[in-house]
Amino acid sequence: MFIKIKETKLPRLYVNCYGKGDPTVVFESGLGCTHFDWEVVQNQISKNTRTFSCDRAGLGNSDTGDLPRSSLDQVHELHTVLNKAKVKAHYIIVAHSIGGYNARLFAGTYPKEVSGIVFVDCSHENQFEDRVKRSSSKEIEIVKSQSIGTEQTFDELLISAKQVSEIREKDALRNIPIIVLTADHKGETSAALTEEAWLKYQGDLVTLSDYSKHIIVEECGHFIQKDKPQVVIDAIKGIVNGMSK
């Protein structure tokens, strides 16, 4: 279905609400990605509790709004859409890649509404700034002149990363359960980030909570929800079941 946000210049955002029960599992996609990435996982989780996925502005079935926008802008829009769709807290946020920024900002902005987070090979707030430090001025200009996906330029990503760094000071995730799923990226290479650096960043995400678990997903690429959907399903169920104890 489509949700209109009159408070902004976004005419319509496309959302999927399936299942019944509490908590609500909210899926947050990676940069330039849509709800289709979660199709298998959402269909399975919807058999046990309520689920929600949304195409951000300019992606999938949603209309194009004012682009680009920072992660904090996207978080405020997500909160508005959840309210308009009458999808009430508590939320377990399942985030992929750059969607991890949004999950952390959401938890920091609306701390009483988030009961858990599953990070699916998520980005770290320092990785883009570190890339700038390791690049020549010419390389930086090339990267900054490019649009990343259809949502954010490199400069907007740096702004979003700064927002996450600032929200980290609130320590909003300290007492909520989180599971960090990290792909071994078999068969994938990246000139922007070494495997050692990626694992360091992933390990740091684990320290955000005193109730955290880190799972390395072997034989898997960046899109764990597609390559190994059962791993994501099991992680979500682990947090949901833990809440009922």
Question: What are the roles of these predicted feature ranges?
Answer:
Residues 88-126:
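Conserved hydrolase catalytic core segment
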Residues 53-94:
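Active-site loop/oxyanion-hole signature of alpha/beta-hydrolase fold enzymes
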Residues 118-151, 194, 200:
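Flexible "cap/lid" loop of the alpha/beta hydrolase fold
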Residues 212, 218-245:
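Catalytic active-site module of serine/aspartate enzymes centered on a nucleophile-bearing elbow/loop
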Residues 174, 180-182:
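Short beta-strand/loop motif that positions the catalytic acidic residue
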Residues 152-170, 197-204:
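Active-site nucleophile elbow and catalytic-triad environment of alpha/beta-hydrolase enzymes
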Residues 187-220, 234:
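Conserved loop-alpha-helix segment in the C-terminal half of the alpha/beta-hydrolase fold
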Residues 11-61:
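Conserved HGGG/HGGXW glycine-rich cap/lid loop of the alpha/beta-hydrolase fold
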